[in-house]
């Protein structure tokens, strides 16, 4: 009898340095944190679908002013422009809700992006931790709960066309 061929270990992807033009075809979807990146960050060539208080429950229906595009819903934006990369950072505003429900809505959002932008790489961004004093005194907005949500969001990544990015270790 033939021995089964062992499945090779996948080669981990390596981070690389890129110049700003890498973000020419990037879309950032997010809440106030993403608004801050759009207004104060250096990636002025990217497209931002971001608004203070944006969450997964309204992200597909809310009309938002997008620079050089106009006021559009996310499905309208996705049908008007082609994106090679889509970064999504949502979840902190929803933290008072059921984590499985948040994850299901996030998954639906990914499905909407994938249907409209089949060739885009999607990056699910971890929710950033809150400060230690907030975490230790708030029953909802605390780092253990944020970590639980982030674990669920990480599970949405397939490592092929959907990737999970967690930069909390850089800030903790």
Predicted regions and their residues:
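Extracytoplasmic/secreted cell-surface and envelope-processing proteins
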Residues: 95-99, 131-139, 172
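Substrate-gating cap/lid alpha-helix
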Residues: 131-167
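Generic structural signal for well-ordered alpha-helices
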Residues: 106-111, 150
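A short helix->loop->beta-strand "cap" motif at the edges of active sites that frequently abuts
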Residues: 117-121
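Alpha/beta-hydrolase-fold catalytic nucleophile elbow
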Residues: 89, 125-126
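Conserved SGNH/GDSL esterase-like catalytic core that processes O-acyl groups on lipids
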Residues: 16-108
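N-terminal cationic-hydrophobic initiation segments that often serve targeting/anchoring roles
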Residues: 78, 113-114, 154-157
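N-terminal, intrinsically disordered, polar/charged segments of Gram-positive cell-envelope systems
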Residues: 1-24
């Amino acid at each position: 009898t033939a021995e089964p061929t062992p499945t090779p270990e996948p080669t981990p992807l390596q981070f690389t340095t890129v110049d700003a033009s890498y973000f020419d075809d990037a879309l950032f979807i997010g809440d106030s944190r993403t608004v801050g990146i759009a207004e104060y960050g250096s990636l002025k060539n990217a497209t931002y679908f971001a608004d203070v208080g944006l969450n997964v429950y309204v992200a597909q229906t809310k009309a938002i002013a997008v620079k050089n595009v106009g006021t559009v819903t996310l499905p309208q934006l996705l049908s008007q422009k082609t994106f090679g990369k889509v970064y999504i950072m949502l979840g902190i505003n929803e933290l008072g809700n059921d984590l499985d429900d948040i994850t299901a809505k996030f998954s639906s959002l990914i499905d909407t992006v994938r249907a409209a932008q089949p060739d885009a790489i999607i990056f699910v961004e971890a929710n950033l931790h809150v400060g230690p004093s907030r975490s230790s005194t708030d029953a909802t907005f605390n780092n253990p709960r944020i970590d639980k949500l982030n674990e669920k969001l990480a599970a949405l990544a397939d490592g092929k066309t959907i990737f999970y990015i967690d930069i909390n270790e850089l800030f903790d």
